Amino acid sequence: MWYDGIDRNTFIKQIYTKVPELLNVRIDAISLKRDGTEVSVVFDMPVYPDNPPEKWNGNNTVSIEISFFVISEFKLEMKDRYMYGNIDIFSHESKIKIVVDGSILCSFVAEAAVIQRMSAYIYIT
């Protein structure tokens, strides 16, 4: 699964009976640190969890931030004003390859990744 090579993935496995693939997700931010060694991706999970913590009651959307470290081969192309697309995260030559394909095209390779935060909120369409 996409989260297997990411540190601090225990919580996501606890709140989902089956963690969904990252298909057609709303992407809030893709940020590259000034020195180019870290990329953070913030996006909404495509499905609300079936076992959310009690403090999330009343919410309908989960936001997740993943930070990737020691970045190479970074590419980014905007096709639309709003960012959404499929996010594919997989093992690649003992590193982590990230590919975003949708209204934004982004790809890069990282040596490590960690889930920095997960939070819930009410998304209004």
Segments from the language model and where they lie:
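Surface-exposed, interaction-prone regions used to assemble/regulate multi-protein complexes
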Residues: 1-125
